Amino acid sequence: MSGNKQIKHIMFKHIVMWRFIEGANGKSKQQHALWVKEHLEALVGVVPEIRSLEVGVNVCVAGTAYDAVLVSAFDDADAMERYKVHPAHVEVAAYFKGITEGRAEADYNI
């Protein structure tokens, strides 16, 4: 058995979590999270690089919790970069300006 085994990555995962500002633009954190869920999930079938995408809205009352999480998959990091600049994604991403107080991101190969 060779110790020089090469691992083939089959997918690239992109995870993002947001904390929204209560009352920003006249909406609650829950309203922001639901808007984000609806509009990001609507990108499936519009942005061809997306292999899978789901947005979860937080149900935990812990003060350290984030309000929404995006779990998305792409063929590779290059595909994710194309997704980020796709006009439909850029339009949705503009919504986040001025409504977030925290954001965390993790990207990895599987």
Give the ranges of each region predicted by the language model.
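Short S/T/G/P-rich N-terminal loop/turn motif that feeds into the first structured element of a domain
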Residues: 2-67, 75-82, 109-110
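C-terminal structural segments of small proteins and small subunits
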Residues: 74-99
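Interfacial aromatic-anchored transmembrane helix boundaries in multi-pass membrane proteins
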Residues: 101-103
